[in-house]
Amino acid sequence: MKAIILAGGQSERFGEPKAFAQINAQPFYKRIIDVLEGTNMFNQIIISTNETLASQFDHSDIIIDEDQNKDKGPLAGIQSVIQHYESEELFFVVSVDTPMISQKAVSKLYQFMVEHLIEDQLDIAGFKEKGRPIPTIAFYSPHTLPYIDDALNSNDYSLKSVYNKVKSDWLDVNLIESPDYWYKNINYQQDLDSLQQDILNR
């Protein structure tokens, strides 16, 4: 099973590439790698990024989005990796701007996916907050690839356009007994400031 860290975004609102922003003196992407390695669930952790950022990562497994899918968002990153490793049974996807993802959350979601995989033939299992899916913290089956291809080819780059067409199910974030910042994504510098304050006050 492989993990995909999505790190190819423009980070315009944040003002700099979020992958290299730091929390507790550690870049976001390195903290996520440490968490994923700590689960002992993945045979490979792949960073999906763009050509501009690729050389800046201190990591050996990097896949660059294809030229025709440049600037097409998370879907392009997911597609780049799944099509490269299509024989893999399952992929865990996490956005690099979710730096406080926890081992507990990844393990719990995997259990949820496996429990529903055979009976419900799930293609995507992710988290939801107040009923709203969070498709950038989710497990994806390679069966999603044709739907991802279709979405990219039709210029509909939304993850929703994929998860609405396949069998998906979502685990409520409240079932993870951790401070709620574990699933929060960082869009602005003030989000990072707030997160650091929350960690200090924990």
From Swiss-Prot:
Q: What is its main location?
A: cytoplasm
Per its UniProt entry, which superkingdom is the organism in? Bacteria
* Sample GO molecular function, one term: GTP binding
In this entry, which stretches build a coiled coil? none
The record's section on Gene3D superfamilies has: Spore Coat Polysaccharide Biosynthesis Protein SpsA, Chain A (3.90.550.10)
**Residues bound to GTP:** L6, A7, G8, K18, D65, D97
**Any one annotated GO CC term:** cytoplasm
Catalytic activity, as annotated: Mo-molybdopterin + GTP + H(+) = Mo-molybdopterin guanine dinucleotide + diphosphate
Q: Report the subcellular localization.
A: Cytoplasm
Kindly report, in one word, the top-level EC class recorded for this enzyme: transferase
GO terms for biological process? Mo-molybdopterin cofactor biosynthetic process
* Requisite cofactors: Mg(2+)
State its Enzyme Commission number(s).
2.7.7.77
Stored Pfam families: NTP_transf_3
Q: Where is Mg(2+) bound in this sequence?
A: D97
Keywords, ordered alphabetically: Cytoplasm, GTP-binding, Magnesium, Metal-binding, Molybdenum cofactor biosynthesis, Nucleotide-binding, Transferase
Entry-linked PANTHER family: MOLYBDENUM COFACTOR GUANYLYLTRANSFERASE
- UniProt domain comment: The N-terminal domain determines nucleotide recognition and specific binding, while the C-terminal domain determines the specific binding to the target protein.
| Function per UniProt | Transfers a GMP moiety from GTP to Mo-molybdopterin (Mo-MPT) cofactor (Moco or molybdenum cofactor) to form Mo-molybdopterin guanine dinucleotide (Mo-MGD) cofactor.
Q: Which family does it belong to?
A: Belongs to the MobA family.
What NCBIfam families has UniProt attached to this entry?
A: PRK00317.1-3
UniProt name for this protein: Probable molybdenum cofactor guanylyltransferase
**Organism, as annotated:** Staphylococcus saprophyticus subsp. saprophyticus (strain ATCC 15305 / DSM 20229 / NCIMB 8711 / NCTC 7292 / S-41)
